[in-house]
Amino acid sequence: MTPLDVMWVCLGGGVGSLGRWWIGRIVGEYHHGAFPLGTFLINISGAFVIGYLSVLFGVDWHDRYGTMLNAGVLTGILGGYTTFSSMQLDAVKLSHKGQGGLAVFYLVASVLSGLFAAWLGAMLAHLQG
Protein backbone atom coordinates (compact mmCIF):
# COMPACT_ATOMS: atom_id res chain seq x y z
CA MET A 1 0.00 0.00 0.00
CA THR A 2 1.37 3.37 -1.01
CA PRO A 3 0.37 6.89 0.03
CA LEU A 4 -1.12 7.28 -3.45
CA ASP A 5 -3.34 4.21 -2.90
CA VAL A 6 -4.55 5.71 0.37
CA MET A 7 -5.33 8.99 -1.38
CA TRP A 8 -7.37 7.25 -4.11
CA VAL A 9 -9.33 5.19 -1.57
CA CYS A 10 -10.06 8.32 0.50
CA LEU A 11 -11.14 10.38 -2.49
CA GLY A 12 -13.23 7.55 -3.90
CA GLY A 13 -14.78 6.83 -0.51
CA GLY A 14 -15.81 10.46 -0.18
CA VAL A 15 -17.42 10.44 -3.63
CA GLY A 16 -19.21 7.15 -2.91
CA SER A 17 -20.45 8.32 0.49
CA LEU A 18 -21.82 11.52 -1.01
CA GLY A 19 -23.60 9.47 -3.67
CA ARG A 20 -25.13 7.22 -1.00
CA TRP A 21 -26.23 10.23 1.05
CA TRP A 22 -27.75 11.96 -2.00
CA ILE A 23 -29.64 8.89 -3.27
CA GLY A 24 -30.80 8.03 0.26
CA ARG A 25 -32.21 11.53 0.67
CA ILE A 26 -34.02 11.45 -2.67
CA VAL A 27 -35.54 8.03 -2.01
CA GLY A 28 -36.50 9.15 1.51
CA GLU A 29 -38.40 12.13 0.10
CA TYR A 30 -40.68 9.84 -1.92
CA HIS A 31 -40.77 6.60 0.07
CA HIS A 32 -42.19 6.72 3.58
CA GLY A 33 -42.89 3.03 4.19
CA ALA A 34 -41.31 0.79 6.81
CA PHE A 35 -39.09 -1.01 4.27
CA PRO A 36 -35.65 0.70 4.09
CA LEU A 37 -35.84 1.18 0.33
CA GLY A 38 -32.99 3.69 0.07
CA THR A 39 -30.39 1.40 1.62
CA PHE A 40 -31.77 -1.55 -0.33
CA LEU A 41 -31.52 0.22 -3.70
CA ILE A 42 -28.06 1.58 -2.93
CA ASN A 43 -26.67 -1.83 -1.97
CA ILE A 44 -28.25 -3.63 -4.94
CA SER A 45 -27.09 -1.04 -7.47
CA GLY A 46 -23.62 -1.08 -5.91
CA ALA A 47 -23.48 -4.88 -6.16
CA PHE A 48 -24.43 -4.69 -9.84
CA VAL A 49 -21.77 -2.07 -10.59
CA ILE A 50 -19.01 -3.87 -8.69
CA GLY A 51 -19.86 -7.13 -10.46
CA TYR A 52 -19.76 -5.37 -13.81
CA LEU A 53 -16.57 -3.39 -13.20
CA SER A 54 -14.71 -6.30 -11.61
CA VAL A 55 -15.10 -8.28 -14.83
CA LEU A 56 -14.51 -5.25 -17.03
CA PHE A 57 -11.28 -4.39 -15.17
CA GLY A 58 -10.25 -8.07 -14.92
CA VAL A 59 -10.03 -7.88 -11.14
CA ASP A 60 -9.65 -11.08 -9.14
CA TRP A 61 -10.13 -11.33 -5.38
CA HIS A 62 -6.41 -11.17 -4.54
CA ASP A 63 -5.62 -8.09 -6.68
CA ARG A 64 -8.59 -5.83 -6.09
CA TYR A 65 -6.58 -3.38 -4.01
CA GLY A 66 -3.58 -2.96 -6.30
CA THR A 67 -4.10 -0.22 -8.86
CA MET A 68 -5.38 3.33 -8.74
CA LEU A 69 -8.46 2.24 -10.67
CA ASN A 70 -9.17 -0.64 -8.29
CA ALA A 71 -8.35 1.34 -5.15
CA GLY A 72 -10.20 4.48 -6.20
CA VAL A 73 -13.26 2.95 -7.85
CA LEU A 74 -13.90 -0.50 -6.39
CA THR A 75 -12.65 -0.02 -2.84
CA GLY A 76 -13.13 3.75 -2.61
CA ILE A 77 -16.25 4.79 -4.53
CA LEU A 78 -18.20 1.54 -4.30
CA GLY A 79 -17.01 0.85 -0.76
CA GLY A 80 -18.23 4.29 0.28
CA TYR A 81 -21.43 3.96 -1.74
CA THR A 82 -22.63 0.60 -0.44
CA THR A 83 -23.38 0.06 3.22
CA PHE A 84 -23.54 -3.32 4.91
CA SER A 85 -23.62 -1.74 8.37
CA SER A 86 -26.66 0.44 7.57
CA MET A 87 -28.46 -2.65 6.28
CA GLN A 88 -27.81 -4.37 9.62
CA LEU A 89 -28.91 -1.30 11.58
CA ASP A 90 -32.09 -1.02 9.50
CA ALA A 91 -32.91 -4.65 10.34
CA VAL A 92 -32.29 -4.09 14.06
CA LYS A 93 -34.52 -1.00 14.03
CA LEU A 94 -37.30 -2.93 12.29
CA SER A 95 -37.02 -5.70 14.90
CA HIS A 96 -37.18 -3.22 17.77
CA LYS A 97 -40.34 -1.77 16.24
CA GLY A 98 -41.96 -5.21 16.34
CA GLN A 99 -41.43 -5.84 12.63
CA GLY A 100 -39.15 -8.86 12.92
CA GLY A 101 -40.69 -10.54 9.89
CA LEU A 102 -39.98 -7.51 7.74
CA ALA A 103 -36.44 -7.37 9.15
CA VAL A 104 -35.78 -10.98 8.13
CA PHE A 105 -37.35 -10.39 4.72
CA TYR A 106 -35.21 -7.28 4.25
CA LEU A 107 -31.98 -9.11 5.12
CA VAL A 108 -32.76 -12.13 2.95
CA ALA A 109 -33.97 -9.97 0.05
CA SER A 110 -30.88 -7.76 0.34
CA VAL A 111 -28.43 -10.65 0.27
CA LEU A 112 -30.17 -12.62 -2.49
CA SER A 113 -30.85 -9.53 -4.61
CA GLY A 114 -27.28 -8.35 -4.10
CA LEU A 115 -25.87 -11.70 -5.21
CA PHE A 116 -28.13 -11.69 -8.26
CA ALA A 117 -27.23 -8.08 -9.10
CA ALA A 118 -23.48 -8.80 -8.85
CA TRP A 119 -23.91 -11.90 -11.02
CA LEU A 120 -25.99 -9.94 -13.54
CA GLY A 121 -23.38 -7.18 -13.69
CA ALA A 122 -20.60 -9.73 -14.22
CA MET A 123 -22.59 -11.52 -16.94
CA LEU A 124 -23.31 -8.25 -18.73
CA ALA A 125 -19.61 -7.39 -18.71
CA HIS A 126 -18.75 -10.86 -20.05
CA LEU A 127 -21.29 -10.44 -22.87
CA GLN A 128 -19.85 -7.07 -23.80
CA GLY A 129 -16.28 -8.29 -23.42
Swiss-Prot record:
- The answer to whether UniProt assigns keyword Transport to this entry is yes
**Protein's name in the database:** Fluoride-specific ion channel FluC 2
The species this protein belongs to is Brucella abortus biovar 1 (strain 9-941)
For this record, an example GO cellular component is: plasma membrane
Q: What is the lineage of its organism?
A: Bacteria, Pseudomonadati, Pseudomonadota, Alphaproteobacteria, Hyphomicrobiales
| Record-linked InterPro entries | FluC
What GO biological process term is on the record, naming one?
cellular detoxification of fluoride
Summary of activators and inhibitors of this protein: Na(+) is not transported, but it plays an essential structural role and its presence is essential for fluoride channel function.
Query: What domain of life?
Result: Bacteria
Q: Where in the cell is it found?
A: Cell inner membrane
